[in-house]
Curated annotation (Swiss-Prot):
It is a multi-pass membrane protein. This is NAD(P)H-quinone oxidoreductase subunit 2 A, chloroplastic. Keywords: Chloroplast, Membrane, NAD, NADP, Plastid, Plastoquinone, Quinone, Thylakoid, Translocase, Transmembrane, Transmembrane helix, Transport. NDH is composed of at least 16 different subunits, 5 of which are encoded in the nucleus. The gene is ndhB1. It comes from Oryza nivara. Belongs to the complex I subunit 2 family. The lineage of its organism: Eukaryota, Viridiplantae, Streptophyta, Embryophyta, Tracheophyta. Its EC number is 7.1.1.-. NDH shuttles electrons from NAD(P)H:plastoquinone, via FMN and iron-sulfur (Fe-S) centers, to quinones in the photosynthetic chain and possibly in a chloroplast respiratory chain. The immediate electron acceptor for the enzyme in this species is believed to be plastoquinone. Couples the redox reaction to proton translocation, and thus conserves the redox energy in a proton gradient. It comes from the Eukaryota.
Amino acid sequence: MIWHVQNENFILDSTRIFMKAFHLLLFQGSFIFPECILIFGLILLLMIDLTSDQKDRPWFYFISSTSLVISITALLFRWREEPIISFSGNFQTNNFNEIFQFLILLCSTLCIPLSVEYIECTEMAITEFLLFVLTATLGGMFLCGANDLITIFVAPECFSLCSYLLSGYTKRDLRSNEATMKYLLMGGASSSILVHGFSWLYGSSGGEIELQEIVNGLINTQMYNSPGISIALISITVGLGFKLSPAPFHQWTPDVYEGSPTPVVAFLSVTSKVAASASATRILDIPFYFSSNEWHLLLEILAILSMILGNLLAITQTSMKRMLAYSSIGQIGYVIIGIIVGDSNDGYASMITYMLFYISMNLGTFACIVLFGLRTGTDNIRDYAGLYTKDPFLALSLALCLLSLGGLPPLAGFFGKLYLFWCGWQAGLYFLVSIGLLTSVLSIYYYLKIVKLLMTGRNQEITPYVRNYRRSPLRSNNSIELSMTVCVIASTIPGISMNPILAIAQDTLF
């Protein structure tokens, strides 16, 4: 009898919860419409996979790409609408969040055609790969719009779990397995530290979980300058540091870059940084408003360490992917300058502008690496020697993307860094900007070293990989070359689009 009553109560409670969730989705689902499009695409992928054979493989790519493009379109139509808080405070919709969601969707849209040929050559499972990419994209989008501590914790875990699975997708590769294990262990440790910081923030604010309500709670409890807030700040900075991978939280980055499939590295190298930057900006700027001096100091230390260590260690690398791993550590140091400057002096606008250029530069470089790797099977920097003699288009594309990453004028990377450093200088961050300028010059050295190898025509320096290099038919690689061409153009011709990009970025206020 008791069991029967408890069972009825459980059914009633479950029904109420389901009806409440259905009510929220029905009346507030429009606020997360771009995310709903991706969810629909995921369901459609699963249904087609269950009911079709291998001949329908092109449909998988088409559905994934189409859902991403439609989601981008939905975001653009919603641009400049009034900020809205929905789902009982779980999500916030505003220009700042939406532009980061747009960047994540853009990354995923460019990464899918970049992966097609690689998946077919390595005989990887297509459906699962695309499901993981779309789910990670969905997690990143939810993270950008998250407005409470629970969602901010759950959304990156959704992204991270898919990232772990993607990095270990080539199960027979020992390096991939090792990289995945390191990634998983360090990711789990960082998540526990992050949630520990959230618990201190929750307790100090009197039990509040929404970001703005936490500020009000700290004022009411007079705990905004307490030791508990300092513990929360340090713990959350460490937890977010793993996602952003600045020094000294970069230990996982080189191994994961080297061991993971190259299209996966391309995807993770940009989406993780975009999502984590959006989350870090909002968490530090809103709940830790009264501790701005403290978190500015912490981020300045991370930025200096990242710019110096990342660029110095990149010089010594022999693997192209490991070199880009250390380069990305240096690049996140530049992005942190924009976070420190904040909304004053266009800090966020400069950060967003540089991230947009970084996406094109980085994905363009990885597209070239994927193409070269498929045709030669090597990742060693020395094996790129003389590539210009065999494939001028690929060599020039790689050279332009690398030089743009280094910030050589008149490429996009130069304008992005110029705007970022100028905003930092205007905000009084003279030492930080000076370090950024010096390390940028240092990065040009190792990028130019690779460009010199690409353009060499001496037979004694050309390796057997390039001597036996054979270009594949254009039809078989057109998807990779399409992504590569788009990224190269975006990395080299910023002048036409610079002013509109800056104007849009300057509108991204909270």
